[in-house]
Amino acid sequence: MKKSLLSFAVLMMGAALFTACSNDDDTPELKKVDVSNGMFVVGSGNKKANIDGNVSYIDYQAGAVTANAFQKANGKSLGKTANYIVDYGSKLYIVVDAEATIWVCDKNTLSVVKQINTIDLLGEKDGVSPRAAVGENGNLYVTFYGDSNNGGNGIVAAIDTVNFAKQTTYTVGSYPDGLTIANGCIYVANSDYGNCKNPSISKIDLGSGKVEEIKDEVITNPMQILTLGSDVYYLDYGTYDASWNQMGAGVRKITASGEVTKVVDGTAMCTDGKKVYTVNAPYGAAETTYLIYDAATGTTTSWNPEGIFSPAVIAADPVTGNIFIVSYQENPETGYPGYALPSYTNQYDAQGKFVKKYENTATGPISVVFNTDVKYVQ
């Protein structure tokens, strides 16, 4: 694991040496090219089976998986209920809800740079249950549920990525989860913990610090949120009946002016920068469908990725456009998804054709991030 990731750092050192050469006319001009080397898969673990949170790394060039990569790199566990991973600059940030911890890791080696105890950083009232994060302007912005004394609202905390100190906090809506940045603002999906009484989208103006609440009848249980162009798309889990059948789940679009519309069904989503890909597997439904929403045309098509038993996460490589679906494997004893078993990940090209299957990825898969960077070529 360390060797394959360190080779990337050596490549970048070589690129730096090239750019430091003389500016003679004979010196070839180097072009900056985006590259993608692999994918980190975070699993929340499994509480019933006493399995901690975990990270696996898929190395494209080697065509192999390093399971429990964090533990192998650091000799310790992530802790209970890992929830999210994001890269910003040269670091990875892994959010662990039940431990009130954010692990700051070197992107090339997964070695821990800093363990941020969020209760120590923010206090008992605000630092409970970190959920998701995004990096911008030298800060890591993190959503927190907070404790029961916070008046029903969560917070977003800005944490400096050099000294890892608190910069400021913003009060947002009830049980904030995913967040994204668009048009100089942070948009936050306030899930209300699925109670469907006070869900909303918070909009934080990073210039003024003003927080606005967006409410609409189609905002019922927002969880994940992303940016595509100047618009924001969020995944709403919808509602559940008395038998826990899931209804009304799908992706909604929020325009820069605040208009909210439902665009496509889904229970998981990702974007390649042009389209929104969804898995539509509502709890209690007889079948799973896979949909593609084209943001430019407003049209929806379907596809049928082969080899998926029980999808958990879908993600698009921002460089190659390849689509990855992380799936639970079948429990051979029950025929149901093996929630305490390692997942597997299928790779498809941009046209939806199967490319490769990676075994033994994370247990309890919940979040992924791609190992991307740049290289310089003639």
Task: Identify the residue ranges that each predicted region occupies.
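Short glycine/acidic-enriched loop and turn motifs that connect beta-strands
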Residues: G45-N50, E99-T101, G146-G151, D192-C196, ...
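Residue position within the beta-strands of beta-propeller blades
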Residues: V41-V42, I94, V142-T143, V188-A189, ...
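A short beta-strand motif characteristic of beta-propeller blades
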Residues: A64-S77, S111-E124, F164-Y170, G209-D216, ...
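Repeated scaffold domains used in trafficking and secretory/extracellular systems
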Residues: P28-E29, S77-V86, G123-G135, V172-N183, ...
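Post-signal peptide N-terminal segment of secreted/secretory-pathway proteins
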Residues: A49-N137
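Intrinsically disordered, low-complexity segments enriched in Gly and acidic/Ser/Thr residues
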Residues: A256-L341
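Acidic, serine/threonine- and glycine-rich low-complexity intrinsically disordered segments
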Residues: V162-A285
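Bacterial Sec-dependent N-terminal signal peptides
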Residues: M1-F40
